[in-house]
């Protein structure tokens, strides 16, 4: 299914995550370089072929999606549902909420 989760809940999901869980960052490469969740896969929401890039991902594994504040990721979930993905959660408040919760961010 598809849901929105708090940063703390997202951290709990990651701590107990199945190996196939994919963390998906839908921000720009510049934003990603400034700091992202460890192991996150980058697909830029603003790319003209964003939907095509999403469509190349495995629809049968679970996803944890985030952006800066929750706006882009919130728009990404309905698109993933249309593309036939089975399960995705969106971090409410994005990486800003994640950072505010004191959770780890990796630069580079």
Where are these regions (language model features)?
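Rhodanese-like catalytic fold shared by cysteine-dependent sulfurtransferases
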Residues: 1-21, 29-64, 71-108
């Amino acid at each position: 299914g598809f849901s929105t989760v708090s940063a703390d809940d997202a951290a709990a999901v990651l701590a107990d995550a199945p190996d196939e869980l994919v963390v998906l960052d839908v921000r720009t490469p510049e934003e990603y370089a400034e700091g992202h969740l460890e192991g996150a896969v980058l697909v830029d929401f603003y790319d003209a072929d964003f939907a095509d890039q999403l469509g190349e991902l495995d629809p049968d594994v679970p996803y944890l999606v985030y952006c800066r504040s929750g706006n882009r990721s919130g728009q990404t979930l309905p698109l993933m549902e249309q593309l036939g993905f089975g399960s995705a959660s969106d971090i409410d408040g994005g990486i800003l909420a994640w950072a505010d919760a004191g959770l780890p961010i990796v630069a580079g």
